[in-house]
Design a protein with these regions (language model features):
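Patatin-like phospholipase
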Residues: 1-48, 61-344
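Catalytic nucleophile serine of serine hydrolases
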Residues: 53
Length: 344
């Protein structure tokens, strides 16, 4: 109703969310550049960022002193990753570590933790029992049990994975009291930011888990998307404001294991003040292969990395349209008519 009544201003936004989803984030590269390089630049009040996996990496780039340069480093490193044959989890983790190191640069950690108004938070999943093992049989069994437990009830996922919320300790985010699953809140510090970001994107089975993160409870930390794929959390926890959520689809899927569970929906109260920006079917049709880039592209274009890289770069270029449409909707006031209640 706030947008219907008064439009959208940069200061109306209190939280910005970024989903996991591998390369799907690429279509928001230009929108992120506009938002963090221009739209939010005069802001004084804290803007809380919450992401999982690639969403966390996006926001770590955005929270640096020169966000445009950091975003370009991230985009270049992410698109440029290549693998010989079928990579091992250790090899994929090593490549991901290179991406995180490259996007942070020499001063990124310090700049993120001293940013004047951006407050970075991101999700990880602390594995329990065999879900935390790197032995393939035990890990497979642990993940299978997690799938079965989650199918019965999302709360049962907490038997296998606990939330690990890394947050900027200068201001506790409004969503820090999230429930449903066991939660560890972990203050960000120079010693743990890089390892935490790597953990947030460490896909189970595909990558090795991250251990011995300073300031975090002992254990193995995996991709934040396991518990919070597209995030069903109390973003505002009763506070005023809007949650800006650029998302690659209209459906919000709480956890990664919920992707095939059609009836698993987010809590309507958590979505009450969420402004979801989703691409239209026409936009998706205009992309190479008529789809948003995804992890399957690594398999589709195996041995043809140049072709994959070219198509991903084309998708990034085409996504400039999303910036134009957002700016036009906000500045013209048309967003008042365009915005519709989010269907849960």
């Amino acid at each position: 109703m706030k947008i219907k009544d008064g439009g959208l201003g940069a200061d109306d936004i209190k939280v910005m969310a970024g989903a996991a989803g591998g390369p799907k984030w690429l279509i928001f590269g230009h929108l992120d550049r506009y938002l963090f390089g221009s739209y939010f630049q005069s802001r004084k009040e804290p803007l809380y960022l919450i992401g999982s996996s690639s969403g966390a990496w996006r926001f770590a780039s955005a929270s640096q002193a020169d966000p445009l340069a950091a975003m370009q480093r991230f985009e270049d490193a992410y698109i440029g990753q290549t693998y010989e044959g079928i990579p091992t989890p250790i090899e994929v983790s090593a490549e991901a570590d290179k991406i995180v190191t490259h996007l942070l640069g020499k001063q990124g950690t310090r700049e993120i933790l001293s940013h004047s108004f951006l407050r970075l938070s991101f999700m990880t999943a602390r594995a329990r029992g065999w879900a935390g093992s790197e032995q393939r049989f035990k890990l497979f069994a642990g993940l299978c049990m997690a799938v079965l437990g989650n199918f019965v009830s999302r709360r049962f996922l907490g038997w296998f994975f606990e939330r690990g919320l890394f947050y900027d300790p200068r201001d506790v985010p409004p969503f820090a009291g999230m429930q449903c699953l066991p939660l560890h809140t972990i203050p960000l510090a120079p010693e743990n930011l890089g390892k935490g970001l790597l953990a947030s994107g460490s896909i189970p089975w595909i990558m090795a888990g991250v251990k011995d993160i300073p300031g975090a409870p002992a254990g193995t930390y995996r991709d934040g998307g396991v518990t919070d794929y597209q995030m069903d959390i109390p973003f505002l926890n009763g506070q005023d404001g809007i949650v800006l959520y650029p998302h690659y689809q209209e459906r919000v899927i709480p956890g990664w294991l919920d992707k095939k569970i059609a009836w698993r929906k987010p809590n309507a109260a958590n979505m009450a003040n969420v402004l979801l920006l989703a691409p239209s079917p026409d936009f998706v049709e205009s992309l190479p292969d008529k789809k948003i880039p995804d992890r399957d592209d690594f398999y589709t274009y195996k041995g043809r990395d140049k072709e994959r890289v070219d198509k991903w770069k084309q998708a990034v270029a085409i996504s400039l349209r999303l910036v134009d449409e957002f700016v036009e909707a906000v500045e013209s006031g048309k967003i008042n008519q365009i915005a519709q209640p989010l269907m849960i």
